[in-house]
């Protein structure tokens, strides 16, 4: 969280006028008794007279409490007007990673984690392990893959244009959360709100890029930097 706040004050205030994030609708699916599914429709709009570009992964959401050096859409949850200082309320899948803390056997824990990750990425466990082995054993491969992944996440919006996305998020209906030393219990009848944000970075992500790709990005004048926030919208976390 501190990183996000520092980056916010570092960026020029005019940056907020370049990119607008708007939550359009949130659709609820209660067909699963263990999870509540939210489909969030949101729009990114270039409000300037020229093309803008930025690193962004639209199909992955993360809690804003996890830090800002990432390309995911960040979200914050509020109860009434109070920011909830907790992580793990919403996730990109139904996988419950909190259960891993109860698995004492390291080998069993890694098998369970691999299965969860493979399911999320829609790949086989063997493919996941092979990829991980290459990354950990070959620094050049890691740098190449990291740069390739980041460059493929570039979003470009022409002048005065917009693009709409949909993202599914899941809530496991738990009300007690603990993040570091923070404990929180979600009120059963309180109104809750979600707010989305993008931290558009450039030089700050140079460590993930090859020297050639970083040079390309550095010389691209359409790349924007800034902290962009959406409207707050009601999200149903009631009992």
Label for each model-derived stretch:
Residues 136-144, 155, 166, 171-237:
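Terminal connector regions
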Residues 48, 56-58, 169, 198:
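A mature extracytoplasmic/lumenal domain signature
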Residues 17-34, 235:
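Low-complexity, acidic Ser/Thr/Pro/Gly-rich terminal tails and inter-domain linkers that flank the onset
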Residues 84-119, 123-126, 140-179:
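Intrinsically disordered, low-complexity Pro/Gly/Ser/Thr-rich segments with frequent PxxP/GP/PP motifs
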Residues 55-83, 88-94, 120-144:
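Short acidic, flexible loop segments centered on an aromatic residue
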Residues 30, 42-51:
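Asparagine-centered strand-capping/turn motif at beta-strand->loop junctions
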Residues 1-23, 42:
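Bacterial Sec-dependent N-terminal signal peptides
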Residues 34-41:
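Short, solvent-exposed loop/turn segments enriched in Ser/Thr/Gly
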């Amino acid at each position: 969280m501190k990183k996000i706040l520092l980056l916010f004050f570092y960026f020029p205030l005019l940056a907020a006028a370049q990119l607008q994030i708007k939550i359009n609708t949130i659709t609820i699916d209660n067909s699963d008794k263990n999870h509540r599914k939210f489909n969030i429709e949101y729009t990114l709009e270039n409000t300037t007279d020229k093309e803008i570009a930025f690193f962004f992964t639209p199909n992955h959401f993360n809690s804003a409490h996890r830090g800002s050096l990432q390309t995911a859409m960040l979200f914050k949850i509020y109860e009434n007007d109070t920011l909830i200082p907790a992580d793990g309320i919403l996730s990109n899948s139904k996988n419950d990673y909190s259960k891993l803390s109860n698995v004492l056997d390291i080998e069993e824990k890694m098998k369970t984690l691999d299965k969860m990750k493979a399911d999320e990425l829609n790949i086989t466990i063997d493919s996941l392990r092979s990829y991980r082995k290459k990354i950990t054993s070959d620094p050049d491969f890691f740098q190449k893959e990291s740069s390739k992944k980041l460059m493929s996440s570039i979003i470009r919006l022409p002048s005065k244009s917009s693009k709409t996305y949909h993202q599914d998020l899941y809530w496991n209906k738990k009300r007690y959360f603990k993040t570091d030393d923070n404990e929180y219990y979600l009120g059963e009848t309180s109104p809750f709100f979600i707010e989305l944000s993008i931290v558009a970075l450039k030089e700050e992500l140079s460590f993930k890029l090859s020297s050639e790709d970083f040079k390309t990005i550095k010389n691209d004048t359409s790349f924007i930097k800034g902290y962009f926030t959406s409207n707050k919208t009601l999200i149903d976390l009631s009992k």
